[in-house]
Amino acid sequence: MSEADARPSNFIRQIIDKDLADGKHTSVHTRFPPEPNGYLHIGHAKSICLNFGIAQDYQGQCNLRFDDTNPEKEDIEYVESIKKDVNWLGFEWDGEVCYSSNYFDKLYEYAIELINKGLAYVDELSPEQIREYRGTLTAPGKPSPYRDRPIEENLALFEKMRAGEFEEGKACLRAKIDMGSSFMVMRDPVIYRVRFATHHQTGDKWCIYPMYDFTHCISDALEGITHSICTLEFMDNRRLYDWVLDNITIDCRPHQYEFSRLNLEYTVMSKRKLNQLVTEKLVDGWDDPRMPTVSGLRRRGFTSASIREFCKRIGVTKQENMIEFGSLESCIRDDLNENAPRAMAVLDPVKIVIENFEEGAVETLTVANHPNKPEMGEREVPFTREVWIEREDFREEANKKYKRLVLGKEVRLRGAYVIKAERIEKDAEGNITTIFCTYDAETLGKNPADGRKVKGVIHWVSADKALPAEIRLYDRLFTVPNPAAADDFAATINPESLVILNGFVEPSLAASEAEKGYQFERMGYFCADSKDSSADNLVFNRTVGLRDTWAKIENQ
């Protein structure tokens, strides 16, 4: 299979193939243009993979450009976070990071050009009046009384706007297009407004700032973008995109293409709703492992490869649809099953005492880090007289389907010996506190000599040598597939989206690298928390379970 055949295929790539074949373009230049007013989420990751992936596959270029035209809501913190996320996802932008603010002087000149052509005017209607005059989807707008000002007057007023002689909301520059258009975006849109705000890149140089729709298309053209790719909600805006470029003097003529945004079950993507979750402390910040932000997914233990694979699997279309959350979980589960080293951890411990094992003795066992990858090596696991096992791995009585430890019967401890439960000890409430066992010293790495069958295998850790750890069991943040459709989306938060347990982990995990995935055998995939875990206070986050338990619930 050739490299071209191995590429993903979608309608955008088909357009690019045709453009190159027809000679419309000789190379491909895309961009990823976030506004630095928040943290990236997995919906942005889809756009990142699309734009940077196209540039990679066509040996082209992809810019990282910050659409920074709204200084009141933007911050350098978001700039740095976005750069980190793009790099973490596995991509490098071409050249220096771009900012729309780099082009403020040129944008101002293009606004002057539109005024000189009679295609823009200074409007002194209030923002409320502008909305009223714009009309509705069923009623045309009506022209502003300032629409037909002479060009010279508009130039003078626009210069006064720049000089700070108008208060905010008292004047704006509008494109002069068509107040009767069936497309609201074409009814004389505002292209400049007054804002007395310090900008994180330009400081206090400007007190007028261009609007997104005016800025975006010109920035694309100035950077030589060939294919400007955005989501479907900007489809109507393409008319304004084209109008601006058709009416200014500029060499490059990019074209805008739209694809469907990512809608993922059991979460929300709206910046407003995500912000509500954070400000109302319904989650623990933007990087809470339950959040769909790139930083939250990273902290939970998702790998960049798994997110790229997810974006590849869901594809690029114009059809709006809801993607199953299980599809995302499947990608990280496949990745970690293949690449994560194994370790043992007991989340809900009950003690076992092996009565015929020497008291105080420590036997060092050697266990493979991965059952199918010998190249991942081995680790040492201490075995002692007292060990912890999962409480759910023992029953006083059980049927034949129960393949774990039962009173009077045997089970194998993973990587160690066969043990037999002889008797138990309970507290005053009837809870089992200790299981007394014996072990078969001849069963390390082999079956019992007399041929008896021992089918069950359970995990364990040494009670003497294991390390205490806080285990955070993360799950889906909402109880319904589409929380955004609920009257009160916050009321659908899953009360069990975070369950905290105090367990024990094997000592090899003492120096666990933050966010590195492990399979805790039989329990799921986990990683050390990047903010709270330390050598003295181990904290592990569950990334995903070994299997999709929600699928069973949804199918009931």
From Swiss-Prot:
Compartments it resides in: Cytoplasm
Gene3D superfamilies cross-referenced by the UniProt entry: Glutamyl-trna Synthetase, Domain 2, Glutamyl-tRNA Synthetase, Domain 3, HUPs, Ribosomal Protein L25, Chain P
Binding site for L-glutamine: 67, 212
Motif mapping: 'KMSKS' region: 268-272
Any Gene Ontology CC annotation: cytosol
Family to which the UniProt record says this protein belongs: Belongs to the class-I aminoacyl-tRNA synthetase family.
The name this protein goes by in its record: Glutamine--tRNA ligase
Top-level taxonomy: Bacteria, Pseudomonadati, Pseudomonadota, Gammaproteobacteria, Vibrionales
